Amino acid sequence: MHIHKIQAREILDSRGNPTIEADVILENGIIGRASVPSGASTGSREACELRDNDPKRYAGKGVQKAVKHVNEEINQALQGLSVSDQENLDRILCQLDNTENKSHLGANAILATSLACARARALSLNQPLYMTLNQGDMMTMPVPMMNILNGGAHADNNVDIQEFMIMPIGAPDFPVALQMGTEIFHVLKSVLKKQGLNTAVGDEGGFAPNIQSNRQALDLLSEAIEKAGFRLGEDIVFALDVAASELFNEGFYHMSSENQKFDSHQLIEYYANLISSYPIASIEDGLDEKDWSGWKQLTTLLGNKVQLVGDDLFVTNPKILQEGIAQGIANAILIKVNQIGTLSETRQAIKLAYDNGYRCVMSHRSGETEDTFIADLAVASGCGQIKTGSLCRTDRTAKYNQLLRINELASLPYAGKNILKR
C-alpha cells in the first residue's frame, strides 16, 4: 500500500467555482481520489484555502497554485510511503507546510491529499471506507439535519437566519428518515407556491423565498410537516444555523428582515422565546465567533435545553475547542474537514469533543462536490448527526445516497431520539 504518485487537478464545485481534486496512485495500481469543498460563511480562524488571486482567471478564484503544490512538493514528500499510517502522512503534510493555518501549501491541497490517501487505503484493503475510518467508536447511522429553507449567505433573499433545518428523529431507521424529509421538502414547495412565494433554491438546495420573519419560516415548515402527515416535536424537530457572525456589526446583531437589532443578551432572549414556541433541538453559531462572553451566557441559560453548536466558533480546531471547553462555551462542535485541513486533526477534534461530553455534527460546505467522504466519516465516528443540505441538487443527495448504501451494508442502528438526551 505504498504511494507511487500523487497528482491533482482543478475541478468545479457546486457553485461553479474552482476547487482541487487529488489522486493518490499506489504501487499496486489502486487510485484513491478526493475533492475539497469551500464555504461561503466562514470562520476567521479556518485553515487557509489557497486561491490564485489572478483576476484574469476565474475572477481570482483559481486553484492552480494548490494543484502545483500537490503535483510537486507533496508528491515528492509522500512518494514511497505507506497509506496504512494516516497520522504519519498528515504529520508530514503539516511539517511540509510549516505554517499555523496551512497557508503555504494551502489547506485545500493538503486536505485533498489526506482524504485521497485514506480512500486509497480502503480500496487496497477491499473494505468500505467507513470501516477503515472507524477507530473503535460505536458506529450509528446519523440523523440528517435537512436544510430545506435557506437564508443568510447561502441565498439571495431577505431571510436573516442562514439555515432552517428539519431533523427526522422519530424515524425507525435512516431510509425512513430520508423518506420523511423528502416528503416534507416536496410538500413545503406546494405550501410556498400556494402562498405565492418563490420556490427557487439556494446554495444547499433549500428553498429561498423572501418572507417577513424567522417565525414565518418556522410556521411554513410546521405547516409542511403537518400536511405531510408527521408530528412536530415527535417525528420531526427543528435545528437552526444562525451564522450570527454574518449578522454582527458594531456591537449589535442585525435582523434586517425584522428591522431589529440585538445585543448578546437580547438575542439570547430572542432564542429563548423561539425555543418556547417551537420544538428547536439545536442552534448553531447563535452568537459571533468572537463574542465569547455572550457564548458563555448563552450556554449557561440555554445549554441544558438545546444543543449549542460551534462552527465559526471552533472551526474544527482542537486547540480552539480546548479553549471553549475550559470556559464552558457551547456543548457541541460542527465538524468540517476543510476547516482544519487533515483527516488526523479532524479526528483529534472529534475525540476531544467526545472526551469532554460535547456532541459532534458532521457537515458539508455550501460549495460542495460529488465527493461523499463525509458520509462515511459520519458513520465511522458515530457522531449521530450530519448536515449535508436539502433534498435536491446532486452535490447534496450524493451524501444521502452514500448513507443509504452504508445502511444496506452495515445494518447499523439509527441515532434517532438518542441525540436529544442531555
From Swiss-Prot:
Cofactor note (record): Binds a second Mg(2+) ion via substrate during catalysis.
Residues that hold Mg(2+) according to the record: D241, E284, D311
Ligand binding ((2R)-2-phosphoglycerate): Q162, K336, R365, S366, K387
Gene3D superfamilies: Enolase-like C-terminal domain, Enolase-like, N-terminal domain
The protein's Enzyme Commission number: 4.2.1.11
Any one annotated GO CC term: cell surface
Active site: E204, K336
Pathway listed: Carbohydrate degradation; glycolysis; pyruvate from D-glyceraldehyde 3-phosphate: step 4/5
GO molecular function: magnesium ion binding; phosphopyruvate hydratase activity
Keywords assigned: Cytoplasm, Glycolysis, Lyase, Magnesium, Metal-binding, Secreted
GO biological process: glycolytic process
Family note: Belongs to the enolase family.
Protein's UniProt name: Enolase
Organism in which the protein naturally occurs: Legionella pneumophila (strain Lens)
